[in-house]
């Protein structure tokens, strides 16, 4: 009864009011799996192609009717009759149908929607949670949330250059407690910002988006908020950053527009990260140098990789070829996992497996354009990532994932393992 009998896509909206693709996969038993595809604002140039219509008269050119049509008329014909529990076969059939290296023919948004909906349908038919269906019996590690509480860069209309300043409540004993700690710091930050006369409106990912005196001030106000909430920085709650430095990279230099167009060389930027990670409890930096600066990644990793998690997002784009090259060069030590960067569940699993086999960490991640879909919460547990990035504890599109993780932790009961400080590099355990 796990045979796919119908596949249907429609155009729906994401958290930014932009169209995206929702797919339903219906099985012979009548069981349905549904998934909605997310979308990013700062996208790596090597990501799989998200198909947009380009009709300026409709949704400012961002419609996805072409991708929807590709699901309903092309992909459906190929996968109807296949077994939904054979995820690899379903994904491979779509990849063969597309035939391009970056999914530009059918669109990664079309292919991913079908891929994730297929997994959901299979799990529902088997009567097991999605994390168990994908990850098997070993899926029981709850991730530490990386909560983006100050938004900058492309995620906010402010003068903060770095895209995300995050808190990482790894000192908690459980996921539920880490979520509580992070949320209390988030509320404390609001009062800290208000006391300084700063705006407390939120950005795309639910974090605050104030204009600050400098990028470093973001760290200082967060440290103040951690203490105000009654926690110890570097013991209970740590800091993480997503620099999204490809967005700052111009003519071989890094330009900090929010600091009066301050220009830094690659060496100066690496010096800055070295300094900040010694001065502050920063345990993870994502995209610390630009996506094409391979030698800079090697140097950054050599300098601070033994004590700081260096995450490749735009650098790796959840792509096994780029990740394998990075591993070979000892560039970075962790991969950010975004299902829509690569475009199928199977390829996502392959990327995480490659990372883990080579001692690289993995961080499951949302996109800035999200929906009520909670698939990534299950995948974080399924793949034992130990870390998840899904925004501030604000906005339903972000909180939906946290609430799903609360359900999973409760369901696992005593079998649940909270990753905690075990994921922090250079930190002695016990």
From Swiss-Prot:
<keyword id="KW-0963">Cytoplasm</keyword>
<dbReference type="InterPro" id="IPR029017">
    <property type="entry name" value="Enolase-like_N"/>
</dbReference>
<dbReference type="InterPro" id="IPR036849">
    <property type="entry name" value="Enolase-like_C_sf"/>
</dbReference>
<dbReference type="GO" id="GO:0009986">
    <property type="term" value="C:cell surface"/>
</dbReference>
<dbReference type="InterPro" id="IPR020810">
    <property type="entry name" value="Enolase_C"/>
</dbReference>
<dbReference type="InterPro" id="IPR000941">
    <property type="entry name" value="Enolase"/>
</dbReference>
<feature type="binding site">
    <location>
        <position position="286"/>
    </location>
    <ligand>
        <name>Mg(2+)</name>
    </ligand>
</feature>
<keyword id="KW-0479">Metal-binding</keyword>
<feature type="binding site">
    <location>
        <position position="338"/>
    </location>
    <ligand>
        <name>(2R)-2-phosphoglycerate</name>
    </ligand>
</feature>
<dbReference type="Pfam" id="PF00113">
    <property type="entry name" value="Enolase_C"/>
</dbReference>
<protein>
    <recommendedName>
        <fullName>Enolase</fullName>
        <ecNumber>4.2.1.11</ecNumber>
    </recommendedName>
</protein>
<dbReference type="InterPro" id="IPR020811">
    <property type="entry name" value="Enolase_N"/>
</dbReference>
<feature type="binding site">
    <location>
        <position position="368"/>
    </location>
    <ligand>
        <name>(2R)-2-phosphoglycerate</name>
    </ligand>
</feature>
<keyword id="KW-0456">Lyase</keyword>
<feature type="active site" description="Proton acceptor">
    <location>
        <position position="338"/>
    </location>
</feature>
<feature type="binding site">
    <location>
        <position position="163"/>
    </location>
    <ligand>
        <name>(2R)-2-phosphoglycerate</name>
    </ligand>
</feature>
<comment type="similarity">
    <text>Belongs to the enolase family.</text>
</comment>
<feature type="binding site">
    <location>
        <position position="313"/>
    </location>
    <ligand>
        <name>Mg(2+)</name>
    </ligand>
</feature>
<feature type="binding site">
    <location>
        <position position="242"/>
    </location>
    <ligand>
        <name>Mg(2+)</name>
    </ligand>
</feature>
<feature type="binding site">
    <location>
        <position position="367"/>
    </location>
    <ligand>
        <name>(2R)-2-phosphoglycerate</name>
    </ligand>
</feature>
<feature type="active site" description="Proton donor">
    <location>
        <position position="205"/>
    </location>
</feature>
<dbReference type="Pfam" id="PF03952">
    <property type="entry name" value="Enolase_N"/>
</dbReference>
<dbReference type="GO" id="GO:0004634">
    <property type="term" value="F:phosphopyruvate hydratase activity"/>
</dbReference>
<dbReference type="InterPro" id="IPR020809">
    <property type="entry name" value="Enolase_CS"/>
</dbReference>
<dbReference type="GO" id="GO:0005576">
    <property type="term" value="C:extracellular region"/>
</dbReference>
<keyword id="KW-0460">Magnesium</keyword>
<keyword id="KW-0324">Glycolysis</keyword>
<comment type="pathway">
    <text>Carbohydrate degradation; glycolysis; pyruvate from D-glyceraldehyde 3-phosphate: step 4/5.</text>
</comment>
<dbReference type="GO" id="GO:0000015">
    <property type="term" value="C:phosphopyruvate hydratase complex"/>
</dbReference>
<dbReference type="GO" id="GO:0006096">
    <property type="term" value="P:glycolytic process"/>
</dbReference>
<keyword id="KW-0964">Secreted</keyword>
<feature type="binding site">
    <location>
        <position position="389"/>
    </location>
    <ligand>
        <name>(2R)-2-phosphoglycerate</name>
    </ligand>
</feature>
<dbReference type="GO" id="GO:0000287">
    <property type="term" value="F:magnesium ion binding"/>
</dbReference>
<comment type="function">
    <text>Catalyzes the reversible conversion of 2-phosphoglycerate (2-PG) into phosphoenolpyruvate (PEP). It is essential for the degradation of carbohydrates via glycolysis.</text>
</comment>
